[in-house]
Amino acid sequence: MRVLITGCGSRGDTEPLVALAARLRELGADARMCLPPDYVERCAEVGVPMVPVGRAVRAGAREPGELPPGAAEVVTEVVAEWFDKVPAAIEGCDAVVTTGLLPAAVAVRSMAEKLGIPYRYTVLSPDHLPSEQSQAERDMYNQGADRLFGDAVNSHRASIGLPPVEHLYDYGYTDQPWLAADPVLSPLRPTDLGTVQTGAWILPDERPLSAELEAFLAAGSTPVYVGFGSSSRPATADAAKMAIKAVRASGRRIVLSRGWADLVLPDDGADCFVVGEVNLQELFGRVAAAIHHDSAGTTLLAMRAGIPQIVVRRVVDNVVEQAYHADRVAELGVGVAVDGPVPTIDSLSAALDTALAPEIRARATTVADTIRADGTTVAAQLLFDAVSLEKPTVPA
């Protein structure tokens, strides 16, 4: 079986796809990827072939003034880029899995439709499921997508002999999307009919921590992790400054993740250490708590490690209410949610005191034992099954 895995999004959107590709290859399938150029090195690290498509997602990797692939002003270019690059990558494939940016997903599904092979759209958080939206919201998304890039999509579809399509939001997501999220952290609701929950897609990380980080960890009390991942809006640096001040006020040391915002330490104090690319699976087992943005991946890794969390709402995007995982952490009793995008020192200090209380730490340890790690295996088996059922008939 040969599978094409595609996506256009942040590191948090992409890492699960890499995990699935690696697992498929372990099971004997041939997996290849189409991703933005940001992820060439990551795919090379795990030995998965990748075709780079379009412009970089990370602001620091783009030219000054160059718009991101999600900008409305460049959406027709994004559609053209994906229709241009996907055909060569999808040739000979038996199935396609995608996530992320809708214009790219619609192009990918069109190619799968042309070949008559299974297409699966994946979301990483239940609040992104179509079933979680009202009909009015879905109508709005469909109308907006059709207006912004419907003509471009249908022009490219016509060029490969496909009929026009409308309601592009529904078309890209399908009526049976996959949810690649752990059922404890992200349970389905009764209204999520048709959704297939596979469990989270996690790639075991065996990379050692750097000697410098090991020395810092060994040199004093257990630190608190502060990081905001792929968030790079101006408020991210301010949120990090507030978090550092709050942790210092508690008398604890800090490991700061540089992230896509290129965060820097406020001074050269010996109580802080900054990291770039790092094995969070290993690091989270060595810290007292994690202060982070509302991220599916970071939240899950902290839960698996059994450490308390302080999750800041709306750091990533203050327009879209990105607060699902912050609220789930609070509901599960494994941490505290605080309002962003720039929380106050007082709110963070109070949250840190609460999160480090014995009952929260005990609850975090208990919940860690319930987190599954077999999501990629479940998804791979679903693909094997789909290919055997939906494989197109070859004319005699």
From Swiss-Prot:
GO annotation, biological process: carbohydrate metabolic process; lipid glycosylation; vancomycin biosynthetic process
Residues in the signal sequence: none
Keyword presence, Glycosyltransferase: yes
Xref: InterPro entries: EryCIII-like_C, Glycosyltransferase_28, GlycoTrans_28_N, UDP_glucos_trans
Pfam families the record matches: EryCIII-like_C, Glyco_transf_28
Chain positions recorded as devancoaminyl-vancomycin binding sites: D127, Q133, Y141, Y169
Catalyzed reaction equations: dTDP-beta-L-4-epi-vancosamine + devancoaminyl-vancomycin = chloroorienticin B + dTDP + H(+)
Residues annotated for dTDP-beta-L-4-epi-vancosamine binding in this entry: S10, R11, G12, R207, S230, E277, V278, H293, D294, S295, A296, G297, T298
Keyword Ligase assigned: no
Keywords: Antibiotic biosynthesis, Glycosyltransferase, Transferase
Chain's role: Catalyzes the attachment of 4-epi-vancosamine from a TDP donor to the beta-OH-Tyr-6 of the aglycone cosubstrate in the biosynthesis of glycopeptide antibiotic chloroeremomycin, a member of the vancomycin group of antibiotics. Strongly prefers devancoaminyl-vancomycin (DVV) as substrate rather than the heptapeptide vancomycin aglycone (AGV). Acts downstream of GtfB.
Family: Belongs to the glycosyltransferase 28 family.
Note: In A.orientalis different glycosyltransferases are involved in biosynthesis of the vancomycin group of antibiotics. GtfA, GtfB (AC P96559) and GtfC (AC P96560) are involved in biosynthesis of antibiotic chloroeremomycin, while GtfD (AC Q9AFC7) and GtfE (AC G4V4R9) are involved in biosynthesis of vancomycin.
PANTHER family named in the record: STEROL 3-BETA-GLUCOSYLTRANSFERASE, STEROL 3-BETA-GLUCOSYLTRANSFERASE UGT80A2
Name of the protein in its database record: dTDP-epi-vancosaminyltransferase
Gene name of the record: gtfA
